[in-house]
């Protein structure tokens, strides 16, 4: 924590590339948290801690290295408590803003407060701190800030065995899985589900599988009037992530691939990067079956959680995934600075209102069919205007 230090104390705490601060004068919840900065550097201990603490591919340095978000090496903040690393955040300083690059992680409010105090003490020119996709264990209460929910990450907490997982599913879900599994086996005697370690599969074979699954996904979405696609760069990034300890599941009828899943391991968790099935086999609920079998593979591999990422699909909740809200969060240096940033404040408020309206409409569509019709008409009108 930061001791509201004078400049002389700040200077004395610089140790090479790192800057360490300890504070006993702030809120009791922050007592004992020590901050360390590494300017434009990411030490090995931070890379390892990112995976161990958050278990999210979008919080990992490996993923960040594959994106276009790194014009330069980020600055690393490490939070210690009792000599142990309890939090790591990577960020860039852009003019008077700190942009946090670490995403899809769940933080305690005291961690966010410790980071805020340390950053504002370390960087005099910074007036605001921005998180793009963060989950909080509890709402923030200290200091001027704005946030809005824009998506969810669906997460399954995995038991020790597949039998325990199966027994925890709802009765109707178990019946659905058993019934459709038997049906697809009965109608296609050569049907199999195979699991591989990704590093055992040649890159060209894995690339072809990704393209095949992408075609299934594209055709399935097209039938519902939606679009999706992966660029060559997206596929290349996925290959790198999958190759490092990933699991690959493939559904076959003889030599014909009809479904599959791709999951990469991050810490103790698996993140489902891709799961799709042939739309021509929709009558067998093969998409849901592929996801279920992939989750079972993660359990066999000893994982703690399986992240199904965003997208509100009924099968996710049927498979016991629980949504973790993702927030866009802006923290201001002071109430005065917030008042001096009207465009930012208005922009956050307007965007938050738009997402809340969108969520309300999605919920109402299940009860008011005319809203679904209105949405389709609006989409057609927007397409025609383009």
Task: Kindly label every feature range from the protein language model.
Residues 102-112, 275-283:
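A short, internal acetyl-CoA/4′-phosphopantetheine-binding micro-motif in the GNAT/acyltransferase core
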Residues 13-83, 91-96, 145-149, 167-282, ...:
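A conserved beta-strand-loop-helix scaffold within acyl/acetyltransferase catalytic domains
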Residues 74, 123-128, 246, 300-303:
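Short, high-confidence coil segments that cap the C-terminus of an alpha-helix
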Residues 117, 228-342:
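Aromatic (often tryptophan-rich) hydrophobic motifs at membrane interfaces
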Residues 94-96, 135-138, 161, 198-201, ...:
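Short, solvent-exposed loop/turn segments at secondary-structure junctions
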Residues 88-90, 101-103:
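N-terminal accessory beta-strand-rich subdomains and adjacent acidic, glycine-rich linkers
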Residues 1-23, 109-192:
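Acyl-donor-binding surface of acyltransferase catalytic domains
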Residues 1-26, 330-386:
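Membrane-proximal basic amphipathic "stem/tether" segments
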């Amino acid at each position: 924590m930061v001791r509201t230090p004078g400049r002389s104390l700040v200077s004395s705490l610089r140790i090479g590339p790192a800057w360490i601060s300890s504070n006993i004068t702030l809120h009791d919840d922050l007592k004992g948290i020590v901050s360390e900065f590494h300017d434009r550097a990411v030490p090995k201990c931070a890379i390892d801690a990112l995976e161990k603490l958050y278990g999210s591919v979008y919080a990992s340095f490996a993923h960040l290295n594959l994106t276009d978000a790194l014009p330069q090496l980020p600055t690393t903040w490490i939070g210690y408590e009792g000599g142990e690393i309890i939090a790591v955040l990577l960020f860039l300083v852009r003019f008077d803003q700190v942009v946090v690059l670490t995403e899809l992680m769940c933080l305690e409010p005291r961690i966010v407060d410790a980071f805020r105090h340390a950053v504002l003490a370390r960087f005099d020119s910074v007036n605001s701190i921005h998180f793009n996709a963060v989950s909080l264990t509890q709402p923030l209460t200290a200091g001027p800030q704005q946030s809005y929910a824009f998506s969810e990450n669906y997460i399954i907490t995995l038991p020790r065995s597949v039998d325990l997982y199966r027994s925890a599913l709802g009765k109707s879900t178990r019946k659905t899985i058993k019934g459709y599994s038997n049906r697809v086996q009965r109608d296609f005697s050569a049907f199999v589900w195979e699991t591989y370690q990704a590093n055992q599969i040649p890159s060209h074979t894995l690339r072809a599988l990704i393209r095949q699954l992408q075609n299934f996904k594209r055709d399935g979405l097209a039938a519902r009037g939606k679009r999706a696609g992966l660029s060559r760069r997206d596929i290349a990034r996925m290959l790198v992530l999958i190759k490092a300890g990933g699991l690959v599941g493939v559904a076959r009828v003889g030599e014909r691939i009809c479904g599959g899943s791709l999951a990469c391991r991050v810490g103790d968790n698996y993140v489902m990067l891709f799961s799709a099935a042939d739309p021509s086999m929709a009558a067998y609920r093969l998409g849901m079956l592929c996801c279920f079998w992939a989750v079972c593979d993660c359990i066999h591999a000893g994982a703690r959680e399986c992240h199904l990422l965003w997208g509100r699909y009924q099968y996710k909740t049927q498979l016991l995934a629980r949504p973790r809200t993702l927030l866009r969060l802006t923290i201001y240096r002071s109430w005065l600075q917030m008042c001096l940033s009207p465009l930012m404040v208005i922009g956050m408020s307007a965007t938050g209102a738009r997402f809340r309206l969108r969520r309300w409409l999605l919920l109402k569509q299940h009860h008011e069919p005319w809203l679904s019709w209105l949405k389709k008409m609006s989409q057609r009108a927007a397409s025609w205007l383009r």
